């Protein structure tokens, strides 16, 4: 009986490991060659507040937002300014305002908050992020930091691991990061399908990082 249980547990563990290796972009060099095409693509964008929002808005201006059937903009709780700027951006493009959705999630860690206490706030942020990603099921998530975007990307990866969504994650490192990645970037590097940096030395230093010039 015990032997049977051990064999079954080992088999399940192996299957879970194989699933992880299949889903984890860092372990699958050909993973992003599979690009599912959707007739009604849905885009989710994390607005990171402050300078992060400024850089993201400049990148979004280069996209054909009208080609996305649904655009979900996510901000941290209390970040009203970022969402107002999104409304301005959407109003200047040829998009249907009805296909735009504004959401927010609790901050993973507030400014000046101690790391021990941030465990609870991060858990709450992650739980809300899971619910949000599962609700909208975006085909692509684009983010550029800070900490709260980690929760959003982790949520997407978990749901993808469970085969509940088929979402691709694109992370764009800040222009301010010249010689080394941000903490958010380091954490998310193995989990992103595309990881874009804006300085060539970063692409040389970090495997999987891509340099395609200044993006903002």
Curated annotation (Swiss-Prot):
It is found in: Endoplasmic reticulum membrane; Nucleus membrane. Residues 26-216 are cytoplasmic. InterPro entries: Oligosacch_biosynth_Alg14. The gene is ALG14. Residues 1-4 are lumenal. The chain crosses the membrane at residues 5-25. The lineage of its organism: Eukaryota, Fungi, Dikarya, Ascomycota, Saccharomycotina. Involved in protein N-glycosylation. Essential for the second step of the dolichol-linked oligosaccharide pathway. The keyword Transmembrane applies. It is a single-pass membrane protein. The keyword Transcription does not apply. Keywords: Endoplasmic reticulum, Membrane, Nucleus, Transmembrane, Transmembrane helix. GO terms for biological process: dolichol-linked oligosaccharide biosynthetic process. Belongs to the ALG14 family. This is UDP-N-acetylglucosamine transferase subunit ALG14. It comes from the Eukaryota.
């Amino acid at each position: 009986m015990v032997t049977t249980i051990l064999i079954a547990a080992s088999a399940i563990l192996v299957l879970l490991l194989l699933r992880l290796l299949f889903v984890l972009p860092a372990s699958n060099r050909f993973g992003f060659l599979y690009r599912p095409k959707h007739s009604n693509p849905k885009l989710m964008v994390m607005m990171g507040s402050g300078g992060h929002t400024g850089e993201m808005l400049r990148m979004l201006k280069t996209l054909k937002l009208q080609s996305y059937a649904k655009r979900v903009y996510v901000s941290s709780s209390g970040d009203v300014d970022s969402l107002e700027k999104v409304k301005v951006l959407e109003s200047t493009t040829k998009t249907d305002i009805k296909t735009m959705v504004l959401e927010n999630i609790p901050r993973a860690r507030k400014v000046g908050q101690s790391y021990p206490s941030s465990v609870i706030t991060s858990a709450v942020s992650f739980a809300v992020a899971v619910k949000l990603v599962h609700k909208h099921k975006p085909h692509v998530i684009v983010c550029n930091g800070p900490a709260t975007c980690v929760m959003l990307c982790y949520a997407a990866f978990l749901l993808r691991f469970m085969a509940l969504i088929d979402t691709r994650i694109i992370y764009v490192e800040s222009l301010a990061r010249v010689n080394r990645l941000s903490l958010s970037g380091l954490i998310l590097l193995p989990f992103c399908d595309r990881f874009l940096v804006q300085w060539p030395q970063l692409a040389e230093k970090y495997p999987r990082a891509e340099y395609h010039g200044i993006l903002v």
